[in-house]
Swiss-Prot record:
EC number: 1.3.1.14
Binding site for FMN: 23, 47-48, 103, 131, 171, 197, 223, 249-250, 271-272
Residues at the catalytic site: 134 (nucleophile)
Source species taxonomy: Bacteria, Bacillati, Bacillota, Bacilli, Lactobacillales
Organism: Streptococcus pneumoniae (strain ATCC BAA-255 / R6)
Free-text cofactor note: Binds 1 FMN per subunit.
Entry-linked SUPFAM superfamilies: FMN-linked oxidoreductases
Keyword set includes Flavoprotein: yes
UniProt protein name: Dihydroorotate dehydrogenase B (NAD(+)), catalytic subunit
Transmembrane stretches, start-end: none
Biological process (GO), any one: 'de novo' pyrimidine nucleobase biosynthetic process
Annotated gene: pyrDB
Length: 312
């Protein structure tokens, strides 16, 4: 009964529970496999993959903030060829029943399509998370990220959906005037779901050098500080679309995960909490039945349907 009440069914994903380590906070799984059995997880969102290898931004690339952190990693990854030849086969060999969500990044719709097509052929990749918080090299769009321009977002998502053999979930940036417009563009382009939110943009300064702490100047802010923002934006989007949402942004406890459900999420991504506590995900999973009992929640699916009805 405990297992059934935690199960989640989404396009392409039948999960034993809703807890998913967020992309960029869990590597390709090997880093955390020494701490616990990854089969405990609902799924894994692996690190972003681009067509070619990327070495990322210069250091320092990480800085602490009150109730969170800043990062400017720069999409460091070994590239599609290595991910297909080494990273995904390791996961399939060690965890053959664990569904993988592949995070895909790029700088043109052609690159998004190529990576989506290639990575979706891996048998353990059951869905793609499309990271559209990247600059675009095809258009002179004055420094806008792809996810800040609904028309660009539509083109990129459509290209990825047409190229992919698995459902595509689109990761939305909160750095927009109207996130609903971008969400609707993704839906119109054929997305099967959404993940949100990506990091906010912030910076810190070193009083001694009088310069930004991050070599890149700015970085993505994550952690508990962004949690209320994530809840608000998830609720805003959930009121306007029937696409399932994998909610993320500052989740560090079982209670926070259930709050995401109340906002309109259908599954939960856990990011920065993995850095402060490598057991964050299994801890949340273990506590779910107890906390659900405390608040009279019989199953996550019933809670999801209850929230969905209230949003209409």
């Amino acid at each position: 009964m405990t297992t059934n009440r935690l199960q989640v069914s989404l396009p392409g994903l039948d999960l034993k529970n809703p807890i998913i380590p967020a992309s960029g906070c869990f590597g390709f799984g090997q880093e955390y496999a020494k701490y616990y059995d990854l089969n405990l997880l609902g799924s894994i969102m692996i690190k972003a993959t681009t067509l070619e290898p990327r070495f990322g931004n210069p250091t320092p690339r990480v800085a602490e903030t009150p109730a969170g952190m800043l990062n400017a990693i720069g999409l460091q990854n070994p590239g599609l060829e290595v991910v297909l030849a080494e990273k995904l086969p390791w996961l399939e060999r060690e965890y053959p029943n664990l569904p993988i969500i592949a995070n895909v990044a790029g700088f043109s719709k052609q690159e998004y399509a190529a990576v989506s097509h290639g990575i979706s052929k891996a048998t353990n990749v059951k869905a793609i998370e499309l990271n559209i918080s990247c600059p675009n090299v095809d258009h002179c769009n004055h420094g806008l990220l792809i996810g800040q321009d609904p028309d660009l977002a539509y083109d990129v998502v459509k290209a990825a959906v047409e190229a992919s053999e698995v459902p595509v979930y689109v990761k939305l940036t909160p750095s927009v005037t109207d996130i609903v417009t971008v969400a609707k563009a993704a839906e119109d382009a054929g997305a099967s779901g959404l993940t949100m939110i990506n990091t906010l943009v912030g910076m810190r300064f070193d009083l001694k050098t009088r310069k930004p702490i991050l070599a890149n100047g700015t970085g993505g802010m994550s952690g508990p500080a962004v949690f209320p923002v994530a809840l608000k934006l998830i609720r805003q989007v959930a009121q306007t679309t029937d696409l399932p949402i994998i909610g993320m942004g500052g989740v560090d406890s079982t209670e926070a995960a259930l709050e995401m459900y109340l906002a309109g999420a259908s599954a939960i991504g856990v990011g920065t909490a993995n850095f402060t506590n490598p057991y964050a995900c299994p801890d949340i999973i273990e506590n779910l039945p107890k906390v659900m009992d405390k608040y009279g929640i019989s199953s996550l699916e019933e809670l999801r349907q209850e929230v969905k009805e209230s949003l209409r």
